[in-house]
Amino acid sequence: AVKIPVTAKTRLGWDCEHIIIEDIAERLQDVGIQALAIHGRTRSQMYSGEADWEPIARVKNNPRIKIPILGNGDITSPEKAKEAFERYGVDGVMIGRATIGHPWIFKQIRHYFETGELLPDLSVKEQIEVIKEQILLSVEWIDEVRGLLHMRRHMASMF
């Protein structure tokens, strides 16, 4: 065993005829992962259609599963994040594509969970400040050329 926690992220299965996430979750738990993130689509679906959270809930409610279960897929708003906890019982959520162009979604979710109120989207001026900060961090983290190329994708999604 290693001294740092090891987690995994997987999908429901290969395709709609092979949704085997409960078996996968048990096997991963048995080999020692500390938490499991589950994307609510199959491999063959990629990102098409809506995420299916019912199999994620079945894993969470499986009495043999003792590790934290994180749900992933279509968390695009504070309301959807809250639904993941309340309706499906997950221990946490992972947010992917919804953060591209909208990195403030985390602040919006936290505010909604704490107050029950939705924060408005950022103004264009506020979005520009976020872009500037992200560009500086990206350039610092990667390098000037690749950092700027990386940020084009995010900037195009903001407006």
Predicted regions and their residues:
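Alpha/beta catalytic cores of nucleotide-metabolism and tRNA/nucleoside-modifying enzymes
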Residues: 3, 17-35, 47, 54, ...
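Conserved anion-binding
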Residues: 3-16, 42-43
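Glycine-rich, proline-tolerant flexible connector loops at the mouths of alpha/beta enzymes
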Residues: 38-48
